[in-house]
Amino acid sequence: MMRHRGALLAVALEPTNMKKPKMRAVGVVPTQRQVAQLEHEHPEISRPTQLKVRTLDVGICGTDREICTFVYGAPPAGSDYLVLGHEALGEVVEVGSGVKHAKVGDLVVPSVRRPCPDPNCRPCQIDRQDFCATWKFNERGINQHHGYMTEFFVDDEKNFVVVPQELRHFAVLAEPLTIAEKGLTQVWQIQSRLPWACEEPGQPKGKGLRAVVLGAGPIGILGAMTCVLNGFDTYVYSRSPKPNDKAALVESFGAKYISIAECTPAQLAERVGNIDLVYEAVGVSKTSFEVMMHLGLNGVFVFTGIPAPEGHIQVEGNQLMRNLVLKNQVIVGTVNADKAAFQAAVRDLGEFKRRWPLALEKVISARHPVENFRELLTGKATGIKNVIAFGK
């Protein structure tokens, strides 16, 4: 008991040895080269602008699988493990006193990258850490920041986008879709250099243009959907010969599927005509540079994939340089995304659902219980997008 201003106040002291509550999580322990189910500290709101979110879905991607081979990925300072997961959908269960827009019960998707601490990094100072100038950012579930493959997580409201309830079953696709959203935004910025570049009222920007998407994985298929939505005559160039499930899916939303096994890059260019855009989503440098040799006049080539560091390829450097100069071509790489790209992804998922509901359903191959994590992260990759379902 303690006395304060003449009143008696009972003070309950928390035992110093009281353990904080734990919850399930999936992560890697790099020092032991383990992929494991972990007991992770249950998070609580510590700042007024934060949301506490219950995890519903977490998508599995190639980055997660690569982290599980221990080629990269680092735990936060003071931790010997890294909780995985950067593609997520959750439900708000608690809001801080300073939260302005989100409310309990909202569905939300979180972003991935957090700003670097350098006050002189102009991109990070304006929340454009996707263009961080110091390379000292951290990323949830990837580098020095725990991810979303756990039961609950807490983050600042500005790092979330609210999702309509009708997108409950698809919104986990928002993060991989942001790659195409940011990439296409940059394409329009680049192509504003063309003297005749202007929008026709009521017409999509890509009308009359041809796009080739390299790869039929989730990044490629979502990129192809975005290209079709924007009016491009869209071709997906991928390994497996027809007929196959991915080819059928691609053609169900209006794109065309061409197999690398049946058509060389030169033949591809003959079939397509002038290639205005190549959206690379395969992470294979040999195929990418072979197709780049056939990029059309005034074309743009967008790199999104990250190939393995080992290995070398031969490139026809002289011809490539001639093409870039004489054909007014541009090559651009894109990584990560800003909040506007997440908002665009949520908007376009709604449009995909309206136009191609069956195709959108097929992008998610299966939902799995948490207990299947090891097979999903370290076994043979199957299907298009596999999801771990934490909640209903």
Feature locations, PLM:
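C-terminal hydrophobic helical "lid"/dimerization subdomain
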Residues: R3-P21, F289, D338-K392
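Glycine-rich beta-strand-centered segment in the early N-terminal region that forms part
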Residues: P43-V58, G73-R122, P164-E166
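Residue-level marker of beta-strand positions
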Residues: Q50, E87, D106-L107, P123, ...
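NAD(P)H dinucleotide-binding glycine-rich loop of Rossmann-like/cofactor-binding domains
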Residues: P117-R210
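Mid-domain Rossmann-like dinucleotide-binding core that forms the NAD(H)/NADP(H) cofactor-binding site
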Residues: L167-E262
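Short amphipathic alpha-helix with an adjacent loop that forms part of the alpha/beta core around
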Residues: E262-G273
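Short SAM/SAH-binding signature in class I
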Residues: I275-A281, V300
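Glycine-rich phosphate-binding loop and adjacent beta-alpha segment
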Residues: S285-E351, F390-K392
